[in-house]
Amino acid sequence: MRSSMSLGAAVVWLVVGAAAPDAAQYQVTETADEIRIVTPQLEAAVRKKGYVSGVAAQSMLDKKTGFRDPGFGLDIVDWIMEPGSDEAYRDQLHPELVYHAGNLYHGQRQKRSIEGPQICTQARQLDPKVIRGADFVAVTQQFQYRTAAPGRKTGSVWKQVLVFPVGRRYFVSMDKIETVNSSDAMFLRIDMPGHLRHQRGDTFSRIWLSYRGEIPASEFFSDFPPDARFDYLRGRDPLPERFIRAYQLRDPKTGKEGPWLAGMTLEPSVVSDAWCHQRGYVCFIEEFGGRPIKAGDSFSAAFIVGYFDSIDEMNQVFDQHRGHTRLEVSPQGWRLGK
């Protein structure tokens, strides 16, 4: 399929890690419920059943510091959506597809589901596959959407690639939609890097958004809607040089500060809307796409998610991989593409 978001007529590939260290020391175990990956830098799990997609909640261990992700998972996937209200046909929708605006959860911007269900909570079961290479381990998984709004087809396919490179405290990922529907502004909703659970800032000290700057934990002690503050909206806000969303972790028992847990969208222009608001937890919903697309086309975004010691380190890693929206993997290697 051709991409409706290509940045040029030709695809430009970046081949990664040709002379990287060996990944033979990676431990990969698989059960009926999950795939677990252990490297010298990280531990992480990918769930097959229950709450699925991305890296499982609190499974990603940074061995350098001993910290884990404090949320519901990393690079977690929801619905295919578009701007607009579903009010005219809401009584015909499966309840899981109904979208109510004008509240603390969704704010004032009208949006509606094209296809569902929400993958993370309703897919129930996926069949992830492991790919091992000389300098990485990867997991691929996909899901075919099975519900749709009136007048829309079911059957679009979500695909995800997660690559764990040798010697890194992060993974590289891609989410891709191969659509059976047309839309003026179709987007995929994900959690990036992932939601942040806390009690009055006990698990984090501050948030850093590359398009907003640093925000203290105290700003998230009370609930507020996503469009009240700290949100990003393409077209309203300047396009940032980098698109990075991160929080500095804190040990809830000792108060000791830990590493930054960051999610980077490697091509900033693909992001149409991004939230950072409090709703019992800090909600890091991100939406990418939001451009015209025809049935039979596809769109994707590429990410880096993991642990970093400083904002400078995050910026350096972003700059090494900037501009990419695709990720391909085989036993021979993995590569980011534009």
Residue ranges and their predicted role:
Residues Y26-V38, A228-K338:
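Beta-strand-rich recognition/accessory modules
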Residues A18-A24:
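Boundary at the C-terminal end of the N-terminal hydrophobic targeting segment
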Residues Q41-K48, S156-F164, G258-T265:
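Broad, structure-driven detector of short, well-ordered beta-strand segments within folded domains
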Residues A32-R146:
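Acidic-aromatic substrate-binding/catalytic surfaces of carbohydrate-active enzymes
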Residues G8-G17:
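Bacterial N-terminal signal peptides
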Residues M1-A9:
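Bacterial N-terminal signal peptides that target proteins for export
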Residues T29, K48, P128-R200:
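Acidic, contiguous internal or C-terminal segments within carbohydrate-active enzymes
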Residues N181-K256:
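Polysaccharide-binding surfaces and accessory modules of carbohydrate-active proteins
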